A protein has these predicted regions:
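Short solvent-exposed loop/turn micro-motifs enriched in small/polar/acidic residues
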Residues: 4-7, 78, 231-233
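His/Glu-based metal-binding/catalytic segments typifying zinc-dependent metallopeptidases
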Residues: 25-26, 34-40, 220-279
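M16/MPP (pitrilysin/insulinase) zinc-metallopeptidase core fold and M16-derived inactive scaffolds
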Residues: 33-97, 276-291
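Short, charged, low-complexity patches
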Residues: 45, 49, 103, 107, ...
Length: 429
């Protein structure tokens, strides 16, 4: 067993079997929150199995060795605890929250679920039907349609191209045996980070985790994600005709991963453009020009290069103007149109929101476990804030010129409105 950062408020330990344990002592409330991260997620799915990790998350808690779904639920609810599974592009997550007195009992239950799920056939089929309903529902939502076609243009054969749900074809193909195989492959101690925050002591918590998980061992080398990353950035446009009351206009760019030196600059640009009522897009395109029902920007934190997206919901007759307006606002960033005061405001906003996102035990357990599973280490909490503060206007403009040159364009709306908006004169699309 190796231990590091002994003076930190976050204590990091690596068990002999490879499990990383993070413990944060926070006695202010009689609550313990735990996040168990698995190095899995959609990046570890074959294209023909898209949705597999999502289905596994839905079925994982529906049965384990000698416990049915009902018995698991009763054990959790009898002490007022919570336990749930979720998945993302870069990791799988099991979350639990209890009062301190019940922490050991619920952690032992979580270990049984994580290590020995039974994946009952009836539960697999039920969750598949629910997932298929969700997929069909997404196919009726203009925003979801626009985002999915944007991701597919940007990422091509990379797993980020697909929705976490997959599609009807891939979800229909999935079987219980696929869940068993995936679980056996990726759910292994050297692929796991356990992050715990609350009214606990470091020594007792590590001893408990060692007792519960210490006899779990891996037999082979850990598997790697399935990348197939697009080699070339080749902006294009795509439209879906749909009888809607508004058009969805979405522009996307292939940005940088969280490990890139440009990550902080792109985070600030996204905040400047689309975070809140004072953001550039909201003020210029909604308040001043009245073009937008909804307008924003987002740039998620990803292990591999993330998409940088600006979007707007607008009246059908404004579709063409909306495309030009969004495009022009992003283009301005490459033309030195970013003031020092605006960048400072974006820094204050992002750091303020970041601080507010680390108040509860659940938030603390989440953020440090997330950084660890991405390979950033818990010190990224400090580094991220330093990186944000260090970004200059020249850095931000340089990042815009490198990553935000020409967008992929995704449109959803009435045929006449969308057709009028394409092609895009003067932009070479």
């Amino acid at each position: 067993m190796t231990t590091s950062l002994p003076k930190s408020t976050i204590h990091r330990t690596v068990l002999n079997n490879g499990i990383v344990v993070l413990v944060t002592e926070n006695p202010s409330a009689d609550i313990v929150a735990t996040r168990i991260f698995v190095r899995a997620g959609s990046c570890y799915e074959n294209r023909t199995e898209a949705g597999l990790t999502y289905l596994l998350s839905a079925v994982l808690t529906k049965g384990c060795d000698n416990l049915s779904s009902l018995e698991i639920a009763e054990q959790i609810e009898s002490v007022g605890a919570s336990l749930s599974a979720d998945t993302s592009a870069d990791y799988f997550l099991l979350s639990l929250k209890t009062v301190t007195a019940d922490f050991a009992e619920i952690l032992r239950l979580a270990a049984r679920i994580l290590r020995n799920p039974t994946f009952p056939e009836a539960e697999v089929e039920l969750e598949k039907r629910i997932a298929l309903q969700d997929i069909r529902s997404q196919q009726e939502q203009p925003f979801s349609i626009a985002f999915e076609q944007l991701q597919q243009m940007i990422y091509q054969k990379h797993p980020y191209a697909m929705s976490a749900l997959g599609d009807e074809f891939t979800m229909n193909r999935l079987k219980r045996e696929d869940l068993v195989r995936y679980h056996q492959t990726y759910f292994r101690p050297d692929n796991i980070v356990i992050s715990i925050a609350g009214r606990v002591t470091i020594a007792d918590t590590i001893a408990l985790v060692e007792e519960v998980f210490g006899d779990w061992h891996s037999l082979a080398e850990p598997p790697q994600p399935i990348l197939n990353f697009p080699i070339n950035v080749e902006p294009q446009h795509k439209a879906t005709y749909k009888q809607t009351q508004q058009s969805i206009v979405m522009l996307g760019y292939l940005g940088a991963s969280v490990i890139s030196a440009d990550y902080a600059a792109l985070k600030l640009l996204s905040t400047y453009l689309g975070n809140g009522l004072s953001s550039r897009l909201f003020v210029e395109l909604r308040e001043k020009r009245g073009l937008a029902y909804d307008v924003s920007a987002f740039y998620p934190t990803r292990l591999f290069p993330a998409s940088f997206v600006v979007y707007m919901g607008t009246a059908p007759e404004n579709t063409k103007i909306a495309v030009a307006g969004l495009w022009a606002e992003v283009d301005l960033l490459c033309r030195n149109q970013l003031e020092e005061d605006a960048l400072t405001a974006a820094k204050n906003k992002i750091l303020g929101q970041y601080a507010l996102g680390k108040q509860t035990n659940a938030q603390i357990a989440q953020i440090y476990g997330w950084y660890e599973i991405l390979g950033l280490g818990i010190d990224f909490d400090r580094k991220f804030q330093e990186q944000i503060m260090a970004v200059s206007t020249a850095d931000a403009i340089a990042a815009a010129c490198q990553y935000l040159r020409e967008p992929y364009v995704s449109l959803v709306g009435q045929e006449d409105a969308v057709t009028t908006a394409m092609p895009f004169p003067g932009h070479g699309v």
